[in-house]
């Protein structure tokens, strides 16, 4: 086949290396975005996808590498408010979440990770002062956390200890925190909520939303498509609900905090105002639904 563009040639060369296994590659699961330690061939399975909270696609497990992703995908950026930038991959890859870059006078924090880290992203973040640390909400968003740490001088990556068994690439950059709260910087605190995963975490930014406070909830507390309510799930794709006890624990973790705005896990999943009261009412609605309140509605 004749290649007419340089990009097609680069893609063909990348495919050839991937298929022949001539170099050790750190393979990435195409379904969940998790990167595995370098190996001659793709892993036989992805435990993250085999768990009931995720899934193996109908066409089966498939794998890629960071090098291949850099050819076929790119990252885009969105300024949400002063000091907060969303970073997401186009076209959509794996789960499709976006990361958040939080810029503060005390230092910058990357909240959650996406699989693709490219030159444009590194340049943007370095231009804004680099990273003080990375913090991740739960195992579905661990992705290429080691690559992100290395790109910014081996910054620490903070994960809740309750989810330690899900780490696929053990590394010195990983720092496990325990308990219910962990202060990353002045005014930036990790909150343990549990729910989706035992170590499910959220981030509270006291100065966000013009000083009213922001919670970055990932999919521990999911901003629904109507942006008027929250959902809480053990598995989102497989529609496995949480218990009332687990959902009330998420609400109880957040209620003592001052916040008016919530950023969930995708670009459009934002509760711009009134989020604290809406979260409170969403917890009660969930409890009522689990208890049978809507059985005859």
Task: Give the predicted meaning of each segment.
Residues 25-92:
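N-terminal juxtadomain amphipathic helix
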Residues 25-44, 51-55, 68-82, 107-117, 132, 146-199, 239-255, ...:
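Metallo-beta-lactamase
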Residues 15-23:
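Short, Lys/Arg-enriched N-terminal segments with co-localized hydrophobic residues
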Residues 86-133, 171-173, 179:
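Pre-active-site segment of Zn-dependent metallo-hydrolases
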Residues 84, 97-99, 198-202:
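Short hydrophobic/aromatic beta-strand or adjacent loop that forms the aromatic wall/cage
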Residues 118-159:
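Active-site metal-binding motif and surrounding structural segment of the metallo-beta-lactamase
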